[in-house]
From Swiss-Prot:
Alphabetized UniProt keyword annotations: Amphibian defense peptide, Antimicrobial, Secreted
Function per UniProt: Has antimicrobial activity.
Species whose genome carries this gene: Phyllomedusa trinitatis (Trinidad leaf frog)
Localization annotation: Secreted
Family: Belongs to the frog skin active peptide (FSAP) family. Dermaseptin subfamily.
Expression sites (tissue/organ): Expressed by the skin glands.
Protein name per Swiss-Prot or TrEMBL: Dermaseptin-3.4TR
UniProt key word Secreted: yes
An annotated GO cellular component: extracellular region
Length: 30
């Protein structure tokens, strides 16, 4: 449902933000 979609979207956003933060710390993913 909508709630599950929101949770999945939030998780994806958090994952992206975490990757960006870690990348800025000096650990590029790619």
């Amino acid at each position: 449902g909508l709630f599950k979609t929101l949770i999945k979207g939030a998780g994806k956003m958090l994952g992206h933000v975490a990757k960006e933060f870690l990348g800025s710390e000096g650990e590029p993913e790619s």
